[in-house]
């Protein structure tokens, strides 16, 4: 089991930048690694000894605090003004952007089980099964550590939306509002089917000593579920070319390039942990009493519109916002203009 490999001490804050003459929307940047209660009990059984959670808080602490969490590839660096390419939500979050950091302080963290500096599996290690509830409990412990009694909102997309719902069920008094984008109270069986094939591919490759190759293939398959059929038709409807006696279709270059990129930065074990966690996700929506805005993308193959309409019907205090995007499930990364109106509700301003 892997702990942090960070260059700062546990339970101590590293001040990345001060608030002296800050850039607008930035303020101080602080990050650290929190030692979670040990052993940390897990929802599906077992526990994690000496578990650690890496976090990053950007902005004026006097502003409303918004927790921003995304898909299983997301991490604590939501945006970064000095190294923009490092921010996983860089097209949506920042000063003057859809999620405007001039109006809130932003808290991110590395998921348990994921690539990053939180506790996760080592190479060839079978990690305990993780639930979205486990991530929610880690977030609650982080808020205790930072002495934040109540946050303004959680903006959660994809897996992050699942964690937001789990937090809302378990710790509703600690958050004023949830924004859930492309995430339901449970996984759709067809989406689980796609992910189960991906996981089987990775496990088979690990047994053959070729885990990275298996992850590359799994990611290539996953890419076919993230975008809409309209986008694939617009981008890749061209004849194949003959390469080395074999036909290569235009879409293959895209899929396998994305697969190689992913396999170069993510370990197979980390992918397996969080992919499984998505499919284990199941919360009781009737117990999420926090006001909740649910954003559904009509073209989303992984989280169908009908599922989110049903979720909103079960949530006691919820509204549904429907958008349309050729980016499908990835719309939360690519549609700042459509998302800005819902982000504008998060700051608590009159």
Stretches with model-predicted labels:
Residues 179-208:
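Flexible "cap/lid" loop of the alpha/beta hydrolase fold
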Residues 198-290:
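Alpha/beta-hydrolase
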Residues 133-152:
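Conserved acidic catalytic loop of the alpha/beta-hydrolase fold
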């Amino acid at each position: 089991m892997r702990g942090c490999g960070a260059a700062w001490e546990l339970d101590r804050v590293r001040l990345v930048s001060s608030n002296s003459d800050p850039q607008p929307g930035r303020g101080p940047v602080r990050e650290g690694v929190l030692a979670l209660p040990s052993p940390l009990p897990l929802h599906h059984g077992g526990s994690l000894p000496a578990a650690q959670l890496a976090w990053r808080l950007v902005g004026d602490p006097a502003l409303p605090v918004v927790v921003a969490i995304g898909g299983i590839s997301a991490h604590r660096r939501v945006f970064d003004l000095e190294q923009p390419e490092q921010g996983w939500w860089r097209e949506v979050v920042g000063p003057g952007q859809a999620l405007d950091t001039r109006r809130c302080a932003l808290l991110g963290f590395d998921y348990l089980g994921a690539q990053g500096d939180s506790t996760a599996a080592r190479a060839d290690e079978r990690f305990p099964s993780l639930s979205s509830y486990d991530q929610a409990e880690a977030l609650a412990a982080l808020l205790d550590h930072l002495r934040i009694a109540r946050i303004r909102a959680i903006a959660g997309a994809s897996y992050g939306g699942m964690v937001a719902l789990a937090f809302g069920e378990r710790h509703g008094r600690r958050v004023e509002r949830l924004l859930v984008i492309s995430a339901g109270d449970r996984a759709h069986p067809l989406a689980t089917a796609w992910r189960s094939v991906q996981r089987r591919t990775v496990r088979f490759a690990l047994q053959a000593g070729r885990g990275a190759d298996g992850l590359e293939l799994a990611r290539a398959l996953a890419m076919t579920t993230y975008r809409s059929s309209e986008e694939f038709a617009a981008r890749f409807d061209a004849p194949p070319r003959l390469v080395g006696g074999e036909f290569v279709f235009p879409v293959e270059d895209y899929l396998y390039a994305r697969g190689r990129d992913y396999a170069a930065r993510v370990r197979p074990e980390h992918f397996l942990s969080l992919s499984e966690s998505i499919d284990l996700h199941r919360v009781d929506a009737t117990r999420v009493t926090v006001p909740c805005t649910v954003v559904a993308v009509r073209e989303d193959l992984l989280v169908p519109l009908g599922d989110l309409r049903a979720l909103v019907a079960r949530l006691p205090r919820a509204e549904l916002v429907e958008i349309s995007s050729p980016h499908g499930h990835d719309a939360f990364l690519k549609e700042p203009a459509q998302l800005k109106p819902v982000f504008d509700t998060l700051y608590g301003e009159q």
